[in-house]
């Protein structure tokens, strides 16, 4: 019985030693693995290469390609209506209309800015297309950055507006044209001037003036007749005197 108990105690001691050995091996392996991963991570973290990269940013990246280039069809001119015919108040037709456009972009070279003059049904905004009365392209430069469009003929009564179309390649964001302000021309009828009625006093003054003028006219005529008669008599006397002188000269000879 004592021997059996002693053997059991021995077996338990061996199991404890084996368990401790296994745990120490597992702990050592775990520590070694963690240390290896820690060294690799630290080396990888500190082993960093630096690169200097310059990035080019476009001012207008929404309307340019990857190289910051605009559409080649557009010369980067940028025209907007800055002035027009002032029709505030009453402007009588017929009347010629104009608009001035200012270029806030690059120089206008090849882009075609088209314009139309519309006769509108009303001036409510947004303006709607009406009958196209005249059209053309912006070309008349009147200043460093100013261009003028105008009608060739005078317009009849109605509501008018210029419509300027943006050229091909222009970054329009959906808006491909610009309207001027509506211009209203009125129909003005000229009233004939009514002659002033003469009063009795005006008639009396006119008659008195006429009567005064008659004697003066008669006196002038009589004076002129007397002068003519005297001139004729003088000429006659001179003629007779001349004839007598000739006769006396002949007698002396």
Swiss-Prot record:
Location, primary (coarse class): secreted
Write out the GO cellular component annotations.
bacterial biofilm matrix; extracellular region
Task: Please give the record's induction comment.
Answer: Part of the tapA-sipW-tasA operon. Expression is directly repressed by the DNA-binding protein master regulator of biofilm formation SinR and activated by the extracellular matrix regulatory protein RemA. Also positively regulated by the sporulation transcription factors sigma H and Spo0A and repressed by the transition phase regulatory protein AbrB, probably indirectly. Induced by a high concentration of salt. During most conditions of growth, may be present at very low levels or is not synthesized at all, due, at least in part, to post-transcriptional repression.
What name appears for this protein in its UniProt entry?
Answer: TasA anchoring/assembly protein
Basic and acidic residues bias located where?
190-241
Leader sequence range is: 1-32
Q: Does the keyword Signal apply?
A: yes
Q: What does this protein do?
A: Required for biofilm formation. Required for the proper anchoring and polymerization of TasA amyloid fibers at the cell surface. Is also a minor component of TasA fibers.
Q: Which InterPro entries match?
A: Signal_pept_SipW-depend-type, TasA
Q: Where is this region: Disordered?
A: 190-253
Give its localization. Secreted, Cell wall; Secreted
What's in the keyword line of the UniProt record?
Answer: Cell wall, Secreted, Signal
The knockout outcome noted for this protein's gene is: Mutation impairs colony surface architecture. Mutant produces fewer and altered amyloid fibers.
List the source organism: Bacillus subtilis (strain 168)
Return the annotated region ranges for Important for TasA fiber formation. 50-57
Superkingdom, taxonomy of origin: Bacteria
Lineage summary = Bacteria, Bacillati, Bacillota, Bacilli, Bacillales
């Amino acid at each position: 019985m004592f021997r059996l108990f002693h053997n059991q105690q021995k077996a338990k001691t061996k199991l404890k030693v084996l368990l401790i050995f296994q745990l120490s091996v597992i702990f050592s392996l775990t520590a070694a693995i963690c240390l290896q991963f820690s060294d690799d991570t630290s080396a990888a973290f500190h082993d960093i290469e630096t690169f200097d990269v310059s990035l080019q940013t476009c001012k207008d990246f929404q309307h340019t390609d990857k190289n910051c280039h605009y559409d080649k069809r557009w010369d980067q001119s940028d025209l907007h209506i800055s002035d027009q015919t002032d029709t505030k108040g009453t402007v009588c037709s017929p009347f010629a209309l104009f608009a001035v456009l200012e270029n806030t972009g690059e120089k206008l070279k090849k882009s075609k800015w088209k314009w139309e003059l519309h006769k509108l049904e009303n001036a409510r905004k947004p303006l709607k297309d009406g009958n196209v009365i005249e059209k053309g392209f912006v070309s008349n430069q009147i200043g460093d950055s100013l261009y003028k469009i105008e009608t060739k003929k005078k317009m009849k009564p109605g509501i008018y507006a210029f419509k300027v179309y943006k050229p091909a390649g222009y970054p329009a964001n959906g808006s491909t044209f610009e309207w001027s302000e509506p211009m209203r021309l009125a129909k003005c009828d000229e009233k004939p001037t009514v002659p002033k009625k003469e009063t009795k006093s005006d008639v009396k003054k006119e008659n008195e003036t006429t009567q005064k003028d008659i004697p003066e006219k008669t006196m002038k005529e009589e004076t002129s007749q007397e002068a003519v008669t005297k001139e004729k008599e003088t000429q006659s006397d001179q003629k007779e005197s001349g004839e007598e002188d000739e006769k006396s000269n002949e007698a002396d000879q």
